[in-house]
Amino acid sequence: HYAANGAAEGRNATTLISAGEGAQAAIVRGSCTTKFDPRASRATNIAVSASRINGVVIQPGEEFSFNKTILPRTAANGYVEAPIYVSGKHSTGTGGGICQVSSTMYSAMLNGGIPATERHPHSLPVPYLPEGRDATIAGNYYDLRFVNIYNTPLQISAVADLRTGTVSVTLIQQ
């Protein structure tokens, strides 16, 4: 739905990898949608980080790093100060909210049976997913990583909708 109708609904649509003649149709391997307050400062960071992973293609056997794909988290790259968790306490930091995108991706991975090669839980519960389905990102030391276990490319579709306050991540096997 998002890839086909996103532009008509005022969102950035993902262009799926076109299958060559004789190729099989794309298969959704995992998908997840979470909700957020689109008026909160973290909404900006959710939108920026979703746009950075949107359309990324992971080749067979290649490892994807969420951190490397969205870095650097600076004001110059569009990230803003927003609430974060630090060692079990509430704080603020540049990029607060990006973990909702990494957590939504991790939940999509779980839904699709794609194992993480690196994943760290938050130090406090998150309100947008059940316990055990979150994936925190911090500095250059906490990352969400996975290897494309399929024999064809895997594409990430990530859409943050600031009107409805939802972020969706879909993993599509080509």
Residue map of PLM features:
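Charge-rich, low-complexity intrinsically disordered regions
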Residues: 1-16
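Well-ordered beta-sheet/strand-loop patches within structured domains
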Residues: 14-174
